[in-house]
Amino acid sequence: MGKLFLIGAGGFIGACLRYTVSSQVPRIKNIPAGTLTVNLLGTIVLAFLTFSSEPQSMVYLVNIGILGSFTTFSTFAYETFKLLEEGQNFSFFLNIFLNVALCLVGVSIAYLALSL
């Protein structure tokens, strides 16, 4: 039961943070920058926590709870599909590229920073 409480509490925090951050970041040339921002921030934090040693309770609270609800693949997929549906082909491909490439760069930065 303790695990579920930590995950649920973290989920509440992450969802509130996601709403706050993503609603404050405007679209940039049709790119849903709010979703990109939360996914990039969440990826970097998750990478730092994963590559460092942390107690299992932190995994439940932060990695699964907070970051699981803070980041959002489903919104990324929906917003990207909407770009395609609206005929925004360049923005469609750019959004995919930015989300994947920047998040991979974020993981790499965290890994390299902790390897020094």
Curated annotation (Swiss-Prot):
Query: What residue ranges are annotated as transmembrane?
Result: 1-21, 31-51, 58-78, 92-112
Q: Which residues bind Na(+) per the record? A: G68, T71
Task: Please tell me whether the keyword Metal-binding is annotated for this protein.
Answer: yes
Biological process (GO) annotations held by this record are:
cellular detoxification of fluoride
Molecular function (GO) terms for this protein are: fluoride channel activity; metal ion binding
Pfam family membership, one: CRCB
According to UniProt, the reaction catalysed is: fluoride(in) = fluoride(out)
The protein's organism comes out as Methanosarcina barkeri (strain Fusaro / DSM 804)
What protein name is recorded for this chain?
A: Fluoride-specific ion channel FluC 1
List the record's Gene Ontology CC terms alphabetically: plasma membrane
Q: What does this chain do?
A: Fluoride-specific ion channel. Important for reducing fluoride concentration in the cell, thus reducing its toxicity.
Record's subcellular location: Cell membrane
Give the regulation of activity.
Answer: Na(+) is not transported, but it plays an essential structural role and its presence is essential for fluoride channel function.
| Record's keyword annotation contains Membrane | yes
- InterPro entries, A to Z: FluC
- What gene is this protein translated from? fluC1
As for membrane topology, the entry says: Multi-pass membrane protein
- Family according to the record: Belongs to the fluoride channel Fluc/FEX (TC 1.A.43) family.
PANTHER family reported for this sequence: FLUORIDE EXPORT PROTEIN 1-RELATED (PTHR28259:SF1)
